[in-house]
């Protein structure tokens, strides 16, 4: 019996050992082996010019994600998955005459990715002659091809293509659709202009066939005031791609009550960043735009640029347009900000804009690329910075690094700032800037530090021709036209060119030569800012013995001077004053020679 028990114990131990060895062997056999990633997409997609939504099947044995490589291809809600599935994307209408191609890419890792091409047909020339008609009570169900079948503004904008015209009846229009690619916050709604169309306001509210636009009689307002006390970050966003000879036209519109965020996040469209903290009225990104007979007024920003922000290589012309009463509560450039773009202004008024930072009026600055600003026959008045620091420069105009700015026939009056109450020019080593004043009047401006009229710093080139800078005040000296050193103290520096000009009481002829026996008194020789003819306000030259009336640059020399600029400034600009009066036979300085 004892032997049986002994052998039983031995047998049991052996069985346990075998079981343990078997389990260990099983663990080895069942060791995890990663799958080789496999991902496959459907074929390339051909899309008509009108765009649309598309679904693409995907085969994958591992988790995947998908991305769009073009801003006109917008992904749907599904951007990832765990295995076999599908995703959708929407293609925007192709509002150009050219075929375009983009890609959608799905990937497991960077090494395991698949792409499909999305090829979209172009619009045809006959598509470009369409006229849309919009009323406040228009319906998205209407075709919008007549006043009697008017549609909504959003419907017309979304369906129009390059070369179309959109006629808008009087009334107030509020955006309801989010900017493409945005997060869809309530404040992301905007009127997006994504094609080179003409958007024309000023028609009667009850317009019928044959109606004529008159913006003064029929205000057409694009307002950022939303329900619930909210405001759109941008009332208008121009995202239209540049096309040969094509430009956006905005005419006869009032753009108001946008409110930018204090958060500097952005969306990228058309190769440009659309910051929600800039451009409460209008933001233009890498587009070609003409703005005529418009008002950009009473927009606000919790950070920068409340009025109009122009960025990323845009080309914008403003004519007969008012930029007024826009306010930055915690930033710079309240009226207009030109960043790495080209801006032209003619017969415009920039009035009553305010910034807590620098520049109440026209701000030109990019940290990395040239910005070009050309202002003709315009008045910049009553703009201000808070002026609490000398660095709060440029009440009306502040041009910074890499900038080139030209003012011709302009009146700069009643502005307030830190240094450079009216105009400031700033540069840095390797980032020089340049400004030229031709036939301008700079008066009645105030600096709480240095340079009541005009201040320029080292690393800048300031050229002054046929211009009156007088009657300005500065708390720390340099009332009128002054260069400052690195300590920002007033100096006797004169600009690179000071020709046929007045600085304070001193009258200059050609080449900085002081005219002996001549003196200028702004109190008796300059009139107040007033309507003296023409579309903008000016200051008259007063008194028969006023040297600025007779010692200015001759007409022939002014015409020749314009040919030296790039681009050239023609005699239709240099040969007339701000009110439109010919300078021929008159050798008078300043913006108004009447």
Give short role names for the model-derived ranges.
Residues 25-29, 38-67:
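Solvent-exposed, low-complexity, repeat-rich "mucin-like" stalks and linkers
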Residues 38, 59-88:
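Surface-exposed binding patches on compact interaction domains or structured appendages
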Residues 14-44, 112-117, 121-128:
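Bacterial Sec-dependent N-terminal signal peptides
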Residues 229-237, 494-495, 507, 511-594:
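C-terminal accessory segments
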Residues 98-110:
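A short beta-strand micro-motif common to beta-rich folds, especially ectodomain repeats
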Residues 154, 159-162, 176-198, 207-251, ...:
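Extracellular beta-strand-rich solenoid/capping regions of secreted or surface-exposed proteins
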Residues 123-155, 170-174, 528-531:
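Right-handed parallel beta-helix/beta-solenoid
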Residues 165, 176-196, 208-215, 290, ...:
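Predominantly extracellular beta-rich ligand-binding scaffolds that present long acidic/polar faces
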């Amino acid at each position: 019996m004892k032997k049986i028990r002994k052998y039983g114990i031995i047998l049991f131990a052996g069985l346990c050992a075998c079981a343990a060895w078997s389990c260990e062997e099983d663990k080895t056999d069942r060791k995890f082996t990663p799958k080789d990633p496999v991902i496959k997409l459907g074929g390339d997609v051909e899309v008509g010019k009108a765009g649309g939504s598309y679904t693409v099947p995907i085969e994958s044995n591992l988790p995947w994600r998908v991305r769009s490589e073009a801003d006109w291809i917008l992904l749907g809600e599904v951007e990832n998955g765990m295995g076999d599935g599908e995703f959708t994307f929407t293609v925007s209408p192709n509002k150009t005459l050219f075929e375009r191609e983009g890609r959608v890419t799905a990937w497991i890792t960077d090494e395991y990715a698949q792409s499909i091409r999305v090829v979209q047909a172009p619009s045809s020339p006959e598509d470009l002659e369409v006229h849309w008609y919009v009323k406040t009570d228009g319906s998205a169900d209407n075709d919008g091809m007549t006043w009697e079948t008017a549609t909504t503004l959003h419907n017309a904008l979304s369906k129009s293509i390059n070369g179309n015209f959109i006629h808008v009846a009087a009334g107030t229009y509020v955006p309801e659709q989010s900017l493409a690619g945005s997060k869809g916050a309530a404040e992301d709604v905007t009127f997006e202009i994504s094609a080179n169309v003409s958007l024309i306001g000023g028609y009667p509210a009850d317009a019928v066939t044959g109606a004529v636009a008159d913006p003064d009689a029929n205000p057409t307002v694009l307002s950022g005031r939303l329900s619930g006390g909210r405001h759109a970050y941008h009332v208008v966003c121009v995202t239209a791609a540049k096309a040969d000879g094509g430009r956006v036209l905005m005419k006869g519109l009032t753009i108001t009550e946008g409110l930018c965020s204090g958060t500097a996040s952005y969306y990228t469209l058309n190769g440009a960043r659309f910051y929600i903290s800039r451009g409460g009225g209008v933001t233009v990104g890498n587009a070609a735009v003409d703005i005529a007979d418009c008002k950009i007024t009473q927009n606000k920003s919790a950070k920068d640029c409340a009025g109009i922000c122009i960025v990323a290589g845009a080309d914008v012309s403003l004519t007969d347009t008012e930029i007024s009463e826009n306010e930055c509560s915690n930033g710079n450039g309240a009226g207009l900000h030109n960043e790495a773009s080209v801006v032209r202004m003619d017969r415009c008024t920039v009035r009553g804009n305010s910034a807590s930072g620098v520049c109440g009026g026209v701000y030109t600055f990019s940290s990395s690329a040239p910005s070009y600003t050309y202002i003709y026959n315009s008045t910049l008045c009553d703009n201000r910075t808070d002026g609490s620091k000398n660095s709060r420069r440029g009440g009306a105009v502040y041009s910074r690094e890499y900038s080139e700015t030209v003012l011709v026939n302009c009146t700069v009056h009643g502005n307030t700032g830190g240094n450079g109450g009216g105009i400031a020019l700033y540069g840095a080593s390797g980032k020089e800037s340049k400004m030229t004043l031709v036939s301008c009047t700079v008066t009645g401006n105030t600096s709480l530090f240095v340079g009541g009229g005009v201040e320029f710093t080292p690393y800048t080139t300031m050229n002054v021709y046929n211009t009156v800078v007088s009657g300005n005040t500065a708390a720390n000296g340099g009332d009128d036209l002054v260069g400052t050193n690195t300590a920002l103290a007033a100096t006797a520096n004169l600009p690179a060119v000071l020709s046929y000009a007045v600085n304070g009481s001193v009258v200059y002829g050609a080449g900085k030569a002081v005219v002996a026996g001549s003196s200028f008194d702004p109190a008796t020789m300059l009139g107040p800012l007033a309507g003296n003819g023409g579309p903008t306000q000016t200051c008259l030259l007063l008194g028969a013995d006023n040297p600025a009336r007779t010692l200015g640059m001759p007409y022939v020399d002014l015409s020749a001077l314009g040919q030296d600029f790039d681009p050239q400034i023609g005699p239709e600009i240099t040969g007339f004053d701000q009110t439109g009066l010919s300078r021929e036979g008159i050798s008078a300085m300043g913006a108004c020679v009447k």
